[in-house]
Regions:
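Conserved catalytic SET/PR domain of SAM-dependent protein methyltransferases, capturing the structural core
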Residues: 1-201
Length: 201
């Protein structure tokens, strides 16, 4: 579930639609939670889909660390990529804002932690990185983990409308991290190794 103070807007001809903040969203805010309405398709289920449906799923889903394609039920599926993203995935099935997001600003993810199937070249943002690779999370997880750590105090101090949708065990584990009682699980654990077979899938 995407943050309630967001909406879908047409951005431009290159990226199409995107998710934009309607109000100020401070850093540390949970901006997305994987909830029970999101659908996770196993590799076998994906193989059974008709080609047009499978192509839609490939475009609008992300891959979790089990190799499942997760299709968000709301406009979260339209969040665009940025090499300087203002949102960051965590290993606790939710994302947080790692910078303040202002009204009219897009919410963006770095697709490098979403287990994309093939490298792709997005719009040039003037950054050193120009290509998103399937294994980027293995290269940049230390940097990305630090961006989460920098917002642990903010997580506890800002309004959190999505908190009630986080699974109790995941929320408890993250709160343990915020209070210094546990180590942060690395976003590296979100990586799907295509060489591993998950039995039952």
């Amino acid at each position: 579930m995407i943050h309630p103070e967001t909406e879908l807007r047409f951005i431009n001809e290159t990226v199409g639609y995107g998710v934009v903040a309607k109000t100020f969203i401070p850093r540390g805010t949970v901006v997305w939670v994987q909830d029970d309405l999101d659908r996770a398709f196993t590799p076998h289920e994906v193989d059974l889909l008709d080609t047009p449906v499978r192509e839609y799923l490939e475009k609008y889903s992300f891959t979790n660390n089990k190799g499942e394609k997760v299709l968000c039920w709301d406009h979260a599926k339209f969040v665009n990529h940025s090499f300087t993203s203002n949102c960051m995935s965590t290993a606790y099935d939710f994302e947080i804002a790692i910078r303040d997001i202002h009204p009219g600003e897009q919410l963006t993810d770095d697709y490098g932690y979403l287990n994309i199937a093939e490298p792709f070249v997005p719009e040039d943002e003037g950054t050193v990185r120009k290509v998103v690779y399937p294994d980027d999370v293995l290269k940049y997880h230390v940097l990305w983990d630090e961006s989460i750590r920098e917002n642990l105090n903010n997580f506890k101090s800002v309004s959190q409308p999505l908190l009630k949708f986080i699974k109790a065990a995941q929320l408890h584990a993250f709160e343990q991290v915020c209070s210094g009682q546990a180590e942060l699980r690395s976003v590296k654990s979100c990586y799907y190794d295509t060489r591993v077979t998950y039995f039952g899938h």
